[in-house]
């Protein structure tokens, strides 16, 4: 039991908040004590959620009983007396109550950095790394004993970027392999207005898009402009890279300019813009009847948590799917953060929202320096649909041949992320599918669950900055599956929601709902029959998947 340096207040440490330093990380000095900061406190639930596999897992979508937002907030939101205790704590430490959201189980406190340090018994420092400049908290955060068990996490002390993107290098120009309508036909998407009356939320970390790109893109498809709008989170907004920044980025890709000549912030802005635009164009083109909402949040743990939380708890139409095209190795983040986001994804499952997450683009090793493979989070959450990548070798109508994606990408090797989690145990629905032991010798959650086209040499035509480009990476697969879920929900008249258990059940019964991908590797794991750690259960055959779900008991 600790005590503050200025009094006899008994305190307890918050579990799982260790700072995991990155290789090459360098501290440059203390955070300005007068800097104004905001942190998000995540509180315990009024009542715990039921075990999801029992409540939802094996049931047909039309048999599932999802919670409404109101029921989730009333039964599983924060307690009023817990919020009162946090409010008293904030006043004692001269922190402002910036936002109180019992339905989201969160309280946002703001104040000077020195007050934040004193309130939580930590030291804030500034850090430089190849990923950029950010803030880190040294020491374990503590809270008064009366908040023990009430405050589960404090987000915002650390501002390290969540999404990491590979540096582009010179390569030959990549021409798109096919158009969106061609890809849609290959994977069985309907020719009609798929996804009608559905809502897809895209979670983006920085960057933005140009409306004129979207208008030209859909005009080229001879389609009307879909319903697309952006939502700003925590000060972030739709901020696409400038035309000059995009020009420098494409000059690097096409060998007209050296990488060393382009500032890192220019590359980051251009890559983020390409990512956001790609997500929108693919999701909206594959499910043209759906409303697309783009949440643009800061590239931090706090930013991503707040974006997902606000969409799930909002007052507008509940989304059928969330698409998250980012990730970082689960071994590089705190356990408190893992548990916090995983808890949000459990909320999504109970609400009937499918969360599609890209598995990563750096293969099984995923930038590891210890020689051991590692998987990305939140793709490793058992409550996410983890989306891996394939290379399409041929497509004649709906006859598609694929292998696990593993190629040279922008001068670097790009490959589908996949492996076995070191943080999450094997979920019940994966136990009979041959998931190997994790690198630490334990049973873990296998990644990915499914796959889709990720190889830029066989990518889909998109439009960014007025330029025709090829879709790239597992970031392109998450919006594809989100669009697929929108089409399924429309046709079934019910929410698929927590869809992974359904897909594994279908795979076990040998249906044609998924196309197995049995060739290729991701640098450590080999593709093969059944589930594999490169492409999961395989790529979709939407029409067969819909038929299987309609007749499932």
Outline where the language-model segments fall.
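Extracellular low-complexity, O-glycosylation-prone Ser/Thr/Pro/Gly-rich "stalks"
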Residues: 395, 494-553
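Active-site-proximal alpha-helical segments within enzyme catalytic domains
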Residues: 476-489
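Short acidic, Gly/Pro-enriched loop/turn segments at secondary-structure junctions
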Residues: 394-400
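Phosphate/diphosphate-binding glycine-rich loops and adjacent basic-rich segments that engage nucleotide
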Residues: 401-406, 410
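A generic structural signal for beta-strand entry/edge sites
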Residues: 104-106
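Short, glycine- and charge-enriched coil/turn segments that flank and shape catalytic ligand pockets
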Residues: 366-370, 396, 511
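Short clusters of hydrophobic/aromatic residues that line enzyme substrate/ligand-binding pockets
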Residues: 378, 405, 429, 462, ...
């Amino acid at each position: 039991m600790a005590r503050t340096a200025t009094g006899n207040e008994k305190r307890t440490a918050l579990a799982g908040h260790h700072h995991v330093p990155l290789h090459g990380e360098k501290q440059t000095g203390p955070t300005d004590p007068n800097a104004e900061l905001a942190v998000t406190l995540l509180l315990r639930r009024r009542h715990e959620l039921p075990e999801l596999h029992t409540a939802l897992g094996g049931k047909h979508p039309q048999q599932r009983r999802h919670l409404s937002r109101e029921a989730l907030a009333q039964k599983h939101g924060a307690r009023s007396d817990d919020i009162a205790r946090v409010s008293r704590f904030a006043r004692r430490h001269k922190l402002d109550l910036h936002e109180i959201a019992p339905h989201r189980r969160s309280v946002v406190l703001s104040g000077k950095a020195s007050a934040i340090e004193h309130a939580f018994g930590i030291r804030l420092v500034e850090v430089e790394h190849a990923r950029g400049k950010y803030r880190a908290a040294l020491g374990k955060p503590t809270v008064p004993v009366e908040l023990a068990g009430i405050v589960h996490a404090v987000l915002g002390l650390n501002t390290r970027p969540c999404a990491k993107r590979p540096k582009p290098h010179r390569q030959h120009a990549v021409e798109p392999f096919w158009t969106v309508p061609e890809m849609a036909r290959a994977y069985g998407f309907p020719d009609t207005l798929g996804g009608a009356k559905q809502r897809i939320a895209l979670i983006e970390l920085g960057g933005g898009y140009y409306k004129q790109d979207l208008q030209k893109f859909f005009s080229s498809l001879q389609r009307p402009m879909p319903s697309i709008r952006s939502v700003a989170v925590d000060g972030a907004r739709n901020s696409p890279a400038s035309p000059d920044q995009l020009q420098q980025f494409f000059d690097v890709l096409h060998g007209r300019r050296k990488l060393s000549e382009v500032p890192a912030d220019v590359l980051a802005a251009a890559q983020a813009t390409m990512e956001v635009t790609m997500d929108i164009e693919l999701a909206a083109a594959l499910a043209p009847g759906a409303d697309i909402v783009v949440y643009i949040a800061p590239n931090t743990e706090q930013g991503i948590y707040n974006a997902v939380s606000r969409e799930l708890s909002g007052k507008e139409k509940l989304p059928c799917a969330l698409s998250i095209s980012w990730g970082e190795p689960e071994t590089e983040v705190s356990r408190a953060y893992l548990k916090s986001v995983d808890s949000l994804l459990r909320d999504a499952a109970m609400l009937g929202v499918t969360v599609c997450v890209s598995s990563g683009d750096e293969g099984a090793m995923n930038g590891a320096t210890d020689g051991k493979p590692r998987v990305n989070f939140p793709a490793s959450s058992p409550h996410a649909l983890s989306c891996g990548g394939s290379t399409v070798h041929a497509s004649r109508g709906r006859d598609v041949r694929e292998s696990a994606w593993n190629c040279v990408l922008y001068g670097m090797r790009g490959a589908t992320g996949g492996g076995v989690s070191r943080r999450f145990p094997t979920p019940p629905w994966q136990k009979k599918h041959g998931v190997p032991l994790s690198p630490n010798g334990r049973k873990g959650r296998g990644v990915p669950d499914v796959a889709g086209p990720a190889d830029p040499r066989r990518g889909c035509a998109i439009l960014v900055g007025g330029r025709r480009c090829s879709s790239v990476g597992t970031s392109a697969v998450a919006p594809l599956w989100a669009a697929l879920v929108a089409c399924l929900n429309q046709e079934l008249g019910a929410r698929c929601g927590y869809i992974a258990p359904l897909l594994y059940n279908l795979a076990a019964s040998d249906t044609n709902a998924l196309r197995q991908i049995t060739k290729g590797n991701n640098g450590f794991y080999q593709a093969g029959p059944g589930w594999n750690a490169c492409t999961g259960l395989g790529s979709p055959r939407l029409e067969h998947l819909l038929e299987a779900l309609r007749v499932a008991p």
